[in-house]
Amino acid sequence: MVPVTWYLWLAAMLFTIGLSGVLLKRNALIVMMSVELMLNAANLTFLAFARQTGDVGGHAIAFFVIAVAAAEAAVGLAVVIAIYRTRGTVNIDEVRALHE
């Protein structure tokens, strides 16, 4: 049996990679993928604690987060496609500069 701390370290690394992608990248698609990675890290944490305690609440929360992430990805991708069609770019800095 794998200790829970290994799952937590993996989740922390995934969350850190996702956070660095959100903070450092300027492409809207990369930022969206980084947010999804952060949500998956949170799911892994919920599932690790649910496995340790034997409670099914962590599994229920993980399914809810997956549903919210799917909706967020669909809406976010639609927004990115609309921005690309109108502006011709998905670079966050250029879109923000055009807004001002």
From Swiss-Prot:
Chief place of localization: membrane
The family this protein is said to belong to: Belongs to the complex I subunit 4L family.
Organism: Anaeromyxobacter sp. (strain Fw109-5)
Gene Ontology molecular functions: NADH:ubiquinone reductase (non-electrogenic) activity; quinone binding
Residues spanning the membrane: 4-24, 29-49, 61-81
Enzyme Commission code(s) on record: 7.1.1.-
Membrane topology: Multi-pass membrane protein
GO biological process: ATP synthesis coupled electron transport
Keyword Iron-sulfur attached: no
Official protein name in the record: NADH-quinone oxidoreductase subunit K
Name of encoding gene: nuoK
Catalytic activity reported: a quinone + NADH + 5 H(+)(in) = a quinol + NAD(+) + 4 H(+)(out)
